[in-house]
Amino acid sequence: MSIYPNVLLDLYPYCNAHCAFCSYHGKIRHVKPMSEEIYHKVIDEIGNSGECIEIMPYYYGEPLLNPKLFEVCDYISDRAPNVKISISTNGSLLNEENIEKLLKIKTFYFFNFSAYAGTKSTYEKLMGLNYDTLDKIEMAVRRFQSERPDVRLCVGATRDPRFVTEEDSVELVRRFGNIVSFHTISFNSQHGNLNIRTTPQTNPCDVIFASAVVYSDGRVGMCCFDVNGDLIVGDVTKTSLFEALNSDLAQKYRRAHINGLKDVIPICRSCTQPV
């Protein structure tokens, strides 16, 4: 078993989309680009451990906005060769230049395209992007299928009737085939108290065990849905990532989930993430 969960690096927390279901634009946390010192420290630590985990060089932002994205990916591939790089994009910035650079990422493992709706009216309302973004995604998918068959591809979608119609789902499958992956959209109190869970729940959530977030200022969180950083358990500017993830507070949060008491944690109490 790995001593590290999968890690999201909050390298460049800015986004050009306006997804109707996302809490990004309602966040109250101060954001800034992550310093080279912080991400080098985290990547070096994981690389020195020899662990085979996933690193996602983004968090609640569009990774292709980051002018240092490919520099960071090269650093991960060189300093932590056992690590698998996963990237999720809204696709709006996919062009020939960026696709060529993405194709050259050595330890690229998983590439997700957030599409969600297949018709023009729904897509532009839901994502806040131009409909021709789906053409850019299709171009990238074809290139990767041809030139990097080792990279797992996924087109993210939902069948949630609050956001899309059946026609949207059918059109996405028509365009992208079996790489379309439908999932439930999760909400918590950071989404403005809309669509949150109000009934008690005791089943533990796997997210708190399987993922960690290093925020742009170096603080460490335990949940990939925690856009505001409410579940902070340490700070890599003061300790190692391993120490942060095994702090007393981190263990307290995990025990609460294991013991059926996750609802004592405010953000978990409202969360609809399936368990």
Per-range role (PLM):
Residues H25, S114-Y116, C223, V236:
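Generic beta-structure capping elements
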Residues M34, L94, Y123, C205, ...:
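Short clusters of hydrophobic/aromatic residues that line enzyme substrate/ligand-binding pockets
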Residues M1-F111, K125-D135:
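Conserved alpha-helical substructure of the radical SAM core
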Residues M139-C154, R174-P200, R219-V220, C224-V275:
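C-terminal accessory region of radical SAM enzymes
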Residues G26-R29, G118-S121, Q251:
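A short, flexible beta-alpha/helix-coil linker loop
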Residues N6-D10, G50-Y58, R79-S86, T107-T119, ...:
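Conserved C-terminal portion of the radical SAM core fold
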Residues F21, H25-I28, S211, G229-D230, ...:
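Secreted/processed peptides and extracellular or luminal domains of membrane proteins
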Residues C15, C19-C22, C205, C223-C224, ...:
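Short cysteine clusters
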